[in-house]
Amino acid sequence: MTHKKRSVTPVQLIALGFFIMMLLGTGLLLLPVSQRNPGNLSVVDAAFTAVSAVSTTGLTVVDTASTFSTFGYVVLCILIQIGGLGITSIGAGLIAFTGRKLRMRDQVLVQEALNYPTMKDVQVLIRSVLITTITVESSAAFVGWFLFCRQFDVLPALGIAIFHSVSTFNHAGFDILGGLLSYRNDVGLQLLTIAENILGGFGFFVILDILRNRRFHKFSLHTKVVLTTSGFLDLTSSLLLKAIEGDSLSWVNAFFMGITSRTSGLTIANVGDFSDASQLLICVLMYIGASPG
């Protein structure tokens, strides 16, 4: 009796890759070097944090700023980046940058990972995605570095800026500042965070479409829908939050909350102090979320 050899599908390989990264992330976060007070982090809490980082969910059961060391921050930052780009995309991108051609199986994996509708120009796409990510995140980190240098020394400010940039662009919602409430009057940091949230919310396909075509009438239907819908939601939600909360929120605060509620989940104000109407609006925005792709 012969047994057919079952081949692993691209979707299964992608899921397996993420599962392995979650296990690896859990192990790394449990290392004493990853924690400020070694031994205080349970296996469950480490696993929860690793899964949240790789899936860019941003939910936490421990305070990120006070629980993890600098090495732990680096681990989380890498997990977030892998979660945002996808382990398949990163691997394929490294191959593409070496000048080698992707095998058909690799191209199928990338297509599935990025939800790309066609096999055409997959190698060009993945290179563009990586370049776009590096450009946006490094630019935001550079600006953030100057902003954080007002409060921290040069090297710590650089580390915080890089983490904040990666977490924000990938909509992970992690922060190592112990919350952003103390920055509610920092217009520069809020505008930088808003800009990264908007770009991350558009998705790679929209950003690349804008860079290539540059005129609205040349954009794909997907890009037009994303730009129109995002603009409407961001403007409407910001105006409603400002109207409901009044003087307790500045215009920049309202714009920040209106955008991040739908994307990264970062907050510049205590949502628990908001009125029921504002909390309901934020729930609706979280349900809608960012655009696909």
Report residues per predicted region.
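Membrane-proximal intracellular helices of multi-pass ion channels
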Residues: 1-293
